[in-house]
């Protein structure tokens, strides 16, 4: 029986960190192009984690009222769901929060949650992360050791995340190695409920980078 089961094992691939245009200002690929791209690679699904309202979102949107910004923000995800249903790939919502070049991937909160919590735009980042965790979100620090010209120093938040992203192919290998060390030594030993280690699989050919 075990032999039969082992032969039937199936590996499912999910992209957990990607950006789409026009919501994320850094992205070049449209939602449809992105969803079709991951479908062509054999992925079972993807999380659309565009930069949130506090980050690298389309600049003209930031002058709109909060709920209008949310409508624009979630429009890519909603279009992604429709495209996924057409071609047979699951599309899930996520967001990427930003704080002075430090980014966090948030999973498990839908549009209605953000509509009910406009106060997050005025909260300290640690308070915002804690509120999201208390609301059931999974919080992952993205590329914690990324080095860019606009990042003046590395910031770590071990008490306000469930895990860290340890694979990001847009980063140097040394940055991923340090993230894995941090995850396996500091984060994994904290006395909190941890269910997964943050990971993201980027295609080097993808135009949607984080």
Annotated model-derived regions:
Residues 91, 139, 186-189:
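Hydrophobic beta-strand scaffold residues
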Residues 28, 121, 140-156, 171:
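Active-site-proximal loop/helix segments of hydrolase catalytic cores
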Residues 50, 143-144, 168, 192-194:
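Short secondary-structure boundary segments
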């Amino acid at each position: 029986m075990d032999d039969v089961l082992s032969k039937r094992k199936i590996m499912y691939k999910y992209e957990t960190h990607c950006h789409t245009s026009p919501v994320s200002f850094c992205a070049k690929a449209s939602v449809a192009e992105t969803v079709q791209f991951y479908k062509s690679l054999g992925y079972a699904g993807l999380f659309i984690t565009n930069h949130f309202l506090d980050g690298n979102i389309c600049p003209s949107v930031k002058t709109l009222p909060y709920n209008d910004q949310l409508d624009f923000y979630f429009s890519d995800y909603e279009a992604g769901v429709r495209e996924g249903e057409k071609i047979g790939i699951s599309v899930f919502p996520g967001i990427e929060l930003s704080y002075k070049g430090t980014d966090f991937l948030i999973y498990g909160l839908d549009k209605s949650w953000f509509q009910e919590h406009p106060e997050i735009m005025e909260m300290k980042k640690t308070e915002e992360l804690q509120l999201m965790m208390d609301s059931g979100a999974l919080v992952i620090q993205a590329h914690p050791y990324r080095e860019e010209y606009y990042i003046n120093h590395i910031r770590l938040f071990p008490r306000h995340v469930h895990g860290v992203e340890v694979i990001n192919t847009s980063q140097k290998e040394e940055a991923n190695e340090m993230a894995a060390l941090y995850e396996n030594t500091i984060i994994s030993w904290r006395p909190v409920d941890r269910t997964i280690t943050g990971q993201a699989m980027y295609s080097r050919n993808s135009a949607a980078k984080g």
